[in-house]
Amino acid sequence: MPPKTRGAVRKPRKKDKKNIALGQAHIKSTFNNTIVSITDPTGAVISWASSGEVGFKGSRKSTPFAAQMAAEAAAKRAQEHGMRKVDVFVKGPGSGRETAIRSLQAAGLEVGSIQDVTPAAHNGCRPPKRRRV
């Protein structure tokens, strides 16, 4: 029986530098995490970051500081692709909403407009029961 040969070794594909000046920043801020996705105008994701991805675990992911770090990381990666101006879409009730927007501006992205696109139920599913602490 001949010795097994390993398959072709795959080289990691280098991301091609897109040159997109205008885009959209989608901030999803839940009670447990904050996810920042920066897309081109068609909606194709250019860069993203979340509180968990930048190194926070557990209940620290839901803090405004974690949202700030995630937004900065996503903005830096987007600027490598030539992003300069974003329109911001915020979704969810979490604590990192405003902090994420501020840190996008601080990272050097110009914020054009801010829209709240939080989905509101028209009396759909029953919400979770009240917490008793």
From Swiss-Prot:
Quote one Gene Ontology molecular function term: structural constituent of ribosome
Superkingdom to which the source organism belongs: Bacteria
Keyword RNA-binding in the entry? The reply is: yes
PROSITE patterns, per this entry? RIBOSOMAL_S11
Task: Enumerate the residue ranges of region (Disordered).
Answer: 1-23
Please indicate if the UniProt record lists Mitochondrion as a keyword.
no
Q: Which GO terms describe its cellular component?
A: ribonucleoprotein complex; ribosome
Picking any one GO biological process from the record gives: translation
Compositionally skewed regions (Basic residues) per UniProt = 7-17
What HAMAP family does the record point to? Ribosomal_uS11
Quaternary structure, per UniProt, is: Part of the 30S ribosomal subunit. Interacts with proteins S7 and S18. Binds to IF-3.
Per its UniProt record, what PANTHER family does this chain match?
40S RIBOSOMAL PROTEIN S14/30S RIBOSOMAL PROTEIN S11
Question: What's this protein's family per the entry?
Answer: Belongs to the universal ribosomal protein uS11 family.
**Protein's name in the database:** Small ribosomal subunit protein uS11
